[in-house]
Amino acid sequence: AGYRNAGVSRLSLGLQSASEEELRLLGRIHTREQFLQSFRAARDAGFDNINVDLMSALPGQSEESWQETLRFVCDLEPEHISAYSLIVEEGTPLYEEYGEMCADLEKYGDYASMPKRLQTKYEGCKCLPDEETDRNMYHHTKTTLAKLGYERYEISNYAKKDRNCRHNEGYWQRKDYLGLGLGAASLVGRERFTNTSDMSEYLENSGNLEKIRTDRETLTREDEMGEFMFLGLRMTKGVSKKDFQEYFGTSIEKIYGEVLEKYKKQGLLLEEDGRICLSRAGIHVSNAVMADFLL
């Protein structure tokens, strides 16, 4: 209630999964019931704009358990749902346990296509879903939420009418943002920087922005072009050729003509009304497509 009274109008709650076993494997410290209590407390405090974060393609997760998570959340009728597919990042505890499995899945596509020795190695494990299962989860998410009035406006984000997350849209449209606090990231003009994540250093230099800010980077024109495309293609409306021309003073075809033509021919990119966006097939290989726009 204190947040609400202070003027905070939107909350984001990280459920990730409605399965206690999946939460445990992720190393989450909350339970399904604790999330439910938090959600109800937010409603009781007057919050009418709540996002719930979900995560698919978890170790041991089946299409059925993912559907149960969706049912659980949809029954609560949040205004916004973010549903991301798990990425096993290097340097994390999950990577230590599943890094090799990720690499093998990327190489062979599914467990049935792996050599016998690898099939034996992973037999009985809490395995990561293969590509087909991951795609099925994504499709089920999109169709289920569409039936309930959620519009997908970004690869992994769904919102009720007029409830898009303006915060995230600012990132995808490369608007300036200023991060406050430990480890917070910022983008101001062409300058990108991150605050120190060391509490002692942060307190010692409180008020001295130059010492608090670390990992500074001045983006080149090529960096900005790459980000314009990479981030813009995440949105269902895609990127505007007119906006590209106005921002960079050159046509999108002059810079990316060969890449655009390649993916249009493959049916992974579409062009309509002066905008370029991912096709349905392109969404499933979006990272590979978008990476080709980084100069």
Regions found by a protein language model. Give the residues of each.
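A short, conserved structural fragment
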Residues: 264-274
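C-terminal scaffold of the Radical SAM
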Residues: 1-250
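Short, amphipathic alpha-helical interaction segments positioned at domain boundaries
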Residues: 281-295
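Minor-groove-contacting beta-hairpin "wing" of winged helix-turn-helix DNA-binding domains
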Residues: 275-279
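Residues at alpha-helix caps and immediate loop-helix transition turns in enzyme cores, especially N-
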Residues: 65-66, 255, 289
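Short amphipathic alpha-helical interaction segments
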Residues: 250-264
